Amino acid sequence: MSSDPRQAPYSYQPSPAQYAREERPGPRLSTPNNRPYDTTFFRNYGVNPFVATEDEVYSTFGMDVDTASYTIARRFLQDGNMPDRESVRTEEFINYFDQDYYDMQDLFSIHVDGALSEFGRPNYHLLRVGVKARDVGFDGRKTANMVFVVDVSGSMDREDRLEMVKRNLYLLGENLKEGDRVGLVVYGSEGRIISDLTSDKQSIMDAVSRLHPGGSTNAEEGLKLAYKMASRGFEEGKINRIILCSDGVANVGRTGPKSILSRVKKFAEKGITLTTLGFGMGNYNDVLMEQLANSGDGSYYYIDRLSEAERLFKNGAGALLQVIGSDAKVQVEFNPDIVDRYRLLGYENRRLEADDFMDDSVDAGEVGAGQTVTALYEIRVKDQAIQNPNGFIGQVRIR
């Protein structure tokens, strides 16, 4: 049995270009003020094809709670442009919205439903598979040591970048839990420590007010200082998190992705995780920001407006900080007697082999308190199965 969905003989086959894992600037777009987006980087992850169940009954993927793709698209539209095609990641659009799954006592609850497909083809249905992590609330969140790494390079000298970052940090300061500690590192041409870890809210606010842009972008140096601070202040049993606020540009130092990503991954294995918050449009590196979060066992968000920050930081940022499941995976096993073929909508960069589901060494996704993961499948039900309303479509497992 082939585990490669692209080998399904009856499946829709995308063109080779759709599988190209290329990284390139998006098209030159005209904004209302005639400033182009010609240095905004996205990656093409292809499109999942249909898979025949006679070839593979398992669909496996890593859970993903990133939502940056949706808010980036919203920013494109706000500026009067259509979103770059490669910026659209279907699962991040779906997971941005509350699916209204009910709470249960377990760490995770599974929700499955479906309906006839709206695309009009006979025997095609849309299947929704949802997973919800238990919400711990403000009081239930562990206390946290948070080191913010703020890009203050010249590329951040815009209203929607550094000034937005500062407003976000002020907002977080108002929502800290007793026992939380915050440190602040900045980087431009070089990295600097602005404030060591402290629980004094006024000191935190004062440090934020001193942020000013200037210089080139030595992201690696800034992260290096942040990890040193986080390591010194590491406390077992607490949340130890680096939060990077940047437009993703890195142009000084050993800034090839491998150098930065390997450092991030090494510290994630020690319990110091990384979340990335993206700001700005034009000269924005979506690819790097997502890769950093993935390597750091964290999540990636794009802040296009202050209300988006309020959504993330509400209730003491429990969903942002408190991890309920690490390397979390979903596996759907389809019943080949009922389902002829299926197609997972989105999660192209989270696909796993069937055997990876039980392999704890395989990196997957992290899910925070109260967060939901939703996957949509387009499935074709066999003709004879239509006459058997008691047949089951399949089973859902999480790990």
Language-model region placement:
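Extracytoplasmic
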Residues: M82-Q99
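An acidic, Ser/Thr-enriched
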Residues: R21-E22, G26-S87, Q105-G114, F119-L127, ...
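Sec-dependent signal peptide cleavage junction
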Residues: M1-S30
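Exposed acidic/Ser/Thr-rich ligand/metal-binding surfaces
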Residues: H111-A328, K382-P389
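Long, highly charged amphipathic alpha-helices
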Residues: I72, E92, R167-L171
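Alpha-helix boundary/capping residues
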Residues: L77-G80, F97-D100, L211, G296, ...
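Juxtamembrane/interface motifs at transmembrane-helix termini
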Residues: I94, I204, Q331-V332
